[in-house]
Amino acid sequence: MVNFQGMHFSADDHSTSKAVVFPILIVIIFLFLSKANAEVYIDKIGRQVDIPSPPRRIVSLAPSITETLFALGLDRQVAGVTMLSTCPEAARSKPRVGTFVNISLERVVGLNPDLVIGTADGNRKETVKQLEGVGLPVYVVNPVSLAEISDMILSIGRITDREDEATTLVRGLHKRARRIAVSLKWLKRPRVFLQIGINPVITAGRGTLHNELIHRAGGVNVYGETPFRYPRCSIEDIIAKTPDIIIVSSMRRGGDFPAVRDGWKKWDAIPAVRDDRIYIIDADLIDHASPRVIDGLEKMAEIIHPGSSLKRE
């Protein structure tokens, strides 16, 4: 029995050990040879990470990270992504390393990456520890607000030698966000209920990116003061909160969202139902803490204030 960084391999299981150990050894040798060109960075949860300069094979552990890497022109360096990394179109052809919350260690190691980028708000701590345990540099980001998304973009640009591209991208995002703020500054803020779960009905509370998007889009989140980030909601409570607008997010892929929207119509005590202000928004635009979130903000602003003079670039 061989104990390798907490992983046990039996001599009786040759196929499993070869499939896992050999790629790990290759990665360790590759990383050892690249150490001379490594630079030390502090990631967003305070960990020290040695990263080759520049990294040439990057594995992304979240759709938001994948979108950021592609936005910085790093498509050739992206060696692997998660299952729901579908944007941009070129990301669909990249090797998959598992789901957002269930990453396959063997698949990541088998891609021989010299950098793995994960997120604290989604990836499991055990996953990061396992990847570290086999010698992989794992840089963790933690964007849960628009300001932190900008910081993430700049950080990823810094560790991948794309600082100029990152700065240009962030400036463009800030310009679009300012345009929205100016356009909506003097408009009345309607009350908004955002539905991001079907069964049970779930919404977004305080401390979430969704809550910030509603506010920046000129609305008031009717659950914005709840201490829970993603609380379950009863229909009675939603009626009591009298939302002027209901926005249904297509969070569960394959759901019959027109039917969900129509299902609200029997609750005509709700102002949003009475005034026929029930809308559907693409979840990918508001769920991923990536540069594309500005598209989600613009779309949400158009929903909440359809008569405004908001201009999209």
Place the predicted regions along the sequence by residue.
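A short, structured surface patch at a secondary-structure boundary
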Residues: 39, 56-122, 222, 267
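Short helix-initiation/N-cap motifs at beta->coil->alpha
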Residues: 44-46, 97-106, 122, 226-236
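Short helices/loops that flank or line small-molecule/ion binding pockets
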Residues: 105-112, 134, 233-242
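Bacterial N-terminal signal peptides
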Residues: 22-32
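A ligand-binding cleft/hinge motif common to bilobed small-molecule-binding domains
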Residues: 122-133, 245-262
